[in-house]
């Protein structure tokens, strides 16, 4: 991949590289990226193995506006004509994360949002953790805590369930939760707030980690924002405290601007 990209950036001779992608529906897409001195194209063929035979589902050619191979190993490319509801850019990772970074990403970071609440976009610690509390974050936190999707009861979440999860996951108090997360004393419940999805937001991945003497782990998290063409839009130091029973608590966050402006959360 590096030699193909180097040939492209140096204006070298015609070159191509073939990539195979396994899709969620068990189909396989062959993508051939072709460069010559006048244009870049991607030729694709998608097929699925059924009844002991391969059946072609789709085939075509797309012109590309540009492509980029980052130092960390992301291949990011832009179509010349963006289809309706499509992303500005497409991407995949050429150089994989280490097994430990992938494990830490899945356990502590996967599913957290940079745009739906401010947990990852402001600095906070035990002294001001209540600043990150908003009702809509519970969906994601519950999923990380239980491994299951939340099923609210008639638009409300029982206080015992809500507080058990949030007190386990953050250094906050019941009073702070009830003051900030739409608690209803008559129902002894918290109102369920649906997150309005935002297209193609950045996502975080753990690229390094430090095991601290106090038992906490400081995760170095880079934000990948493909639509901005960046695999290090900003960098977080997210500190967590693992417990012996397998649960954990988020203890603090520090964010640093790198290649892109940090999103500003507004409810």
Predicted regions and their residues:
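Mature, Sec-exported extracytoplasmic domains of Gram-positive
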Residues: 1-267
